[in-house]
UniProtKB/Swiss-Prot annotation:
CC annotations in GO: extracellular region
Xref: SUPFAM superfamilies: Snake toxin-like (SSF57302)
TM segment ranges: none
Keywords: Disulfide bond, Secreted, Toxin
Disulphide bonds in the chain: C3-C24, C6-C11, C17-C42, C46-C57, C58-C63
Subcellular location: Secreted
Taxonomic path: Eukaryota, Metazoa, Chordata, Craniata, Vertebrata
Principal subcellular localisation of the protein: secreted
One MF annotation (Gene Ontology) recorded for this entry: toxin activity
Record protein name field: Weak neurotoxin 8
Family, per entry: Belongs to the three-finger toxin family. Ancestral subfamily. Orphan group II sub-subfamily.
Length: 65
């Protein structure tokens, strides 16, 4: 699996996921709309959203755009 992996909105850096990591995810805080920082990468399971966070998970190559 290959996922995007960088904190910017318009990410172009990809990462080959390690064994056991079968999920691509994108996570961000919905309160900070102007200076939005993303956490994007690979995971074994979909990360749990904290209050006011949005988490999106998928399982195909480069799907976490």
């Amino acid at each position: 699996l290959t996922c995007l992996n960088c904190p910017e909105v318009y990410c172009r850096r990809f990462q080959k996921c390690r064994n056991g990591e079968k999920i691509c995810f994108k996570k961000f805080d919905q309160r900070n709309l102007l200076g939005k920082r993303y956490e994007i990468g690979c995971a074994a399971t979909c990360p749990e959203a904290k209050p006011r966070e949005i988490v999106q998970c998928c399982s195909t190559d480069k799907c976490n755009r």
